[in-house]
Amino acid sequence: MAKVALVTGGSRGIGAAISKALKEAGYTVAANYAGNDDAARAFTEETGIKTYKWSVADYDACAAGIKQVEEELGPIAVLVNNAGITRDAMFHKMTPQQWKEVIDTNLTGLFNMTHPVWSGMRDRKYGRIVNISSINGQKGQAGQANYSAAKAGDLGFTKALAQEGARAGITVNAICPGYIGTEMVRAIDEKVLNEGIIPQIPVAAWAEPEEIARCVVFLASEDAGFITGSTHQAPNGGQFFV
């Protein structure tokens, strides 16, 4: 019987690539989303992957959504915490609401999603948790104090939880992408991309979502059973100093 993998933010961008790659690797995949219903339906029609709508910022919604997934597909063996948002602003202009929304989704969302699956993974003596952090959680980024703080928190969460899960057969790892060729990045002004961003990357190109997805598939696999508490940078050579 195929293992069940749940991917948050799993119907768009990096998450969609992860969902597709896990399905191709033989997993039964559930893709969580919180936004556009039409886009989610189109994703399901294209891939055959079931989608489930709830906000990772809401603990009760996460618990209910996870219960539904497990009732329909089986126990969750792989959890990919990918959902994330940005509310960028220089700190002197950042509002409490902008801070709270990012922390609630990008950091507290990891607790909200992982806590309901943790006991089951412990009971079954098996689990794979992959947290999608960011290179900006390691180096920081002006205009993203909220995002950088949340993504740095994801790394601390990963390392602490890995220690708790190690003897229960649960691995917990993080991936820190740099600039990835998603719709969001492609929408950046071309001059900013070509003059400000691309020159910072030694290979002079961003990564594609599928490249991050392949990292996730590896960390979810049996081959990665001895890897836990690790942070995997994927910035195409950028930020070597981190």
From Swiss-Prot:
Instruction: Please give the GO cellular component terms listed in this UniProt entry.
Output: cytoplasm
Q: Please provide, alphabetically and separated by semicolons, the GO molecular function terms listed in this UniProt record.
A: acetoacetyl-CoA reductase activity
The EC number(s) this enzyme carries: 1.1.1.36
Q: Can you tell me which residues bind substrate?
A: 88, 141-144, 178-179
Q: What else is known?
A: NADH was preferred to NADPH as a substrate.
Keyword Chaperone assigned to the entry: answer is no
Lineage, highest ranks first: Bacteria, Pseudomonadati, Pseudomonadota, Alphaproteobacteria, Rhodobacterales
Which residues constitute the catalytic centre?
A: 147
SUPFAM superfamilies, A to Z: NAD(P)-binding Rossmann-fold domains
SMART domains membership: PKS_KR
**In its UniProt entry, what is this protein called?**
Acetoacetyl-CoA reductase
Source organism (scientific name): Paracoccus denitrificans
Q: Where does NADP(+) bind?
A: 12-14, 82-86, 177-180
A Gene Ontology biological process noted in the UniProt record is: poly-hydroxybutyrate biosynthetic process
**What reaction does this enzyme carry out catalytically?**
a (3R)-3-hydroxyacyl-CoA + NADP(+) = a 3-oxoacyl-CoA + NADPH + H(+)
Q: Which family does it belong to?
A: Belongs to the short-chain dehydrogenases/reductases (SDR) family.
Question: Sorted alphabetically, which keywords does the UniProt record give?
Answer: Cytoplasm, NAD, NADP, Oxidoreductase, PHB biosynthesis
